[in-house]
Amino acid sequence: MLNSKQRAKLKSVASAENAIFQIGKGGVGEAAVKSIYDALEARELVKISVLDNSDTDPREAAEQIAELTSSEVVTVIGRKIILFKVASKPEKRSVSALI
């Protein structure tokens, strides 16, 4: 569980990053969840954009993805989702070393 200072630090790190995933009309699919999980293992911090044509609510999508990937929702701002998960390999823990 992240505290407010950790969330603030992760938000500041993610603000400079572009969204690397998009959720469209199809919603949150199995392939998307697998790709997001792999990215979380490699990067620890992932920014996702929910497109305007998507019927999926960003908050609900964030909770669903977080549950399926065992990650934590850092924040949902508008249609952007930021997720964090500590990498299982210690050499991949660049972001978690900051918090």
What are these regions (language model features)?
Residues 1-99:
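Positively charged, polar, low-complexity stretches
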